[in-house]
């Protein structure tokens, strides 16, 4: 390992928006006759929306939806989400990102979202921390999480190898994707799911909240530099 090379941090969660997404999934899919409770929605966090819908349709209707059919249904979910209040930044995430930036790491955002308004907001609200050329969205990949493609794409954009990166995830499917990409994966449990679900997907480290990870960053960073 050339320790002079630029290293990379892939971060998934920046806003505390999942409670709104969960309710939006429930309300919108109910109109089509698909059942997904707000609690269940957390299990699919990080997956591309159209893939979530196709999976639900296959399980509940035994029907293979086309990409166009799923995209039309996802638009209903997006419209429902737009009615929700503005999501605040995840507690502790901006301070964490500033520490990461100070340590000289590239920050790559990997999101399953395809909402252009969110992608534009990321760069403006995290000024100097997030850059559009280092955002991986649903537009950049054919296969979303739990497939490793989003993180492999992030590695390629940053120009680093898997052992030169850390994935920060808060969803089981995202953890699975990070592990499958052979990247050291930190799970931060920001939702209601039991920590065992994150552990079962192979997370290398698990923190109970974003502030606890932020407060532990200096120690983790020092250990990582000395690998």
Residue ranges and their predicted role:
Residues 14, 89, 107, 167-168, ...:
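Conserved SAM-binding loop
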Residues 13, 111-113:
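Conserved phosphate-coupling serine/threonine residues in phosphotransfer and NTP-handling enzymes
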Residues 1-7, 11:
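Single conserved hydrophobic/aromatic residue that forms the stacking wall/gate
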Residues 46-81, 91, 99:
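A metal-dependent, Asp-based hydrolase signature
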Residues 30, 101, 179:
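Anion (oxyanion) recognition and catalysis
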Residues 82-109:
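Short, acidic loop-to-helix structural element flanking the phosphoryl-transfer center
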Residues 22-43:
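Conserved phosphoryl-transfer catalytic core
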Residues 68, 94, 98, 114-227:
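Asp-based, Mg2+/Mn2+-dependent phosphohydrolase catalytic module
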